[in-house]
């Protein structure tokens, strides 16, 4: 498959092993896993960080295989979800850091272009989340207010 902003093929990467059932060696107690997810979320970890902690420290290679639900779904069920989805928040943070870099390095043309591409991704993602009702209907990405939104 081609890359998003380049007209060439991507590079190969590792693939997660195909499994339909939980490995015998893993921790597969559903209540314990869900409780750990809620506890880690209340401690301030993102869903991606929760997955890494469960994999590395608690022997849960795949939460969806063990519980039948994704980490995000478990977080939403317990009303611990943030107002801005995690992937959108990460892209907005990336764009904000690029803007701060460009304030000091105005002639950095490569970064200017990368900022345009990143903000285009943000706008596409906002359009998707407004359509799926994860964001309110009139929600629009504005670079001026992004820092205030991310500080919450």
Swiss-Prot record:
Keywords: Ribonucleoprotein, Ribosomal protein. GO terms for molecular function: small ribosomal subunit rRNA binding; structural constituent of ribosome. The keyword Ribosomal protein applies. CDD domains: Ribosomal_S15p_S13e (cd00353). InterPro entries: Ribosomal_uS15 (IPR000589), Ribosomal_uS15_arc_euk (IPR023029), Ribosomal_uS15_N (IPR012606), uS15_NS1_RNA-bd_sf (IPR009068). Pfam families: Ribosomal_S13_N, Ribosomal_S15. The keyword Ribosomal protein applies. GO terms for biological process: translation. One of its GO terms (cellular component) is cytosolic small ribosomal subunit. HAMAP family: Ribosomal_uS15_A. NCBIfam families: PRK08561.1. Belongs to the universal ribosomal protein uS15 family. Part of the 30S ribosomal subunit. This is Small ribosomal subunit protein uS15. It comes from Methanocorpusculum labreanum (strain ATCC 43576 / DSM 4855 / Z).
């Amino acid at each position: 498959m081609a890359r998003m902003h380049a007209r060439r093929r991507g590079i190969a990467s590792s693939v997660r092993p195909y499994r339909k059932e939980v490995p015998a060696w893993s921790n597969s107690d559903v209540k314990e896993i869900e409780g750990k997810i809620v506890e880690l979320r209340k401690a301030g970890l993102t869903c991606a960080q929760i997955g890494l902690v469960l994999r590395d420290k608690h022997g849960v290679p795949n939460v969806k295989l063990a519980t039948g639900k994704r980490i995000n779904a478990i977080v939403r069920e317990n009303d611990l979800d943030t107002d801005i989805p995690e992937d959108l928040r990460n892209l907005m943070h990336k764009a904000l850091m690029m803007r701060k870099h460009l304030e000091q390095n105005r002639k950095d043309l490569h970064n200017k272009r990368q900022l345009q591409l990143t903000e285009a991704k943000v706008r596409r993602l906002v359009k998707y989340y407004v359509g799926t009702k994860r964001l309110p209907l009139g929600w629009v990405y504005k670079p001026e207010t992004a820092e205030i939104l991310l500080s919450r």
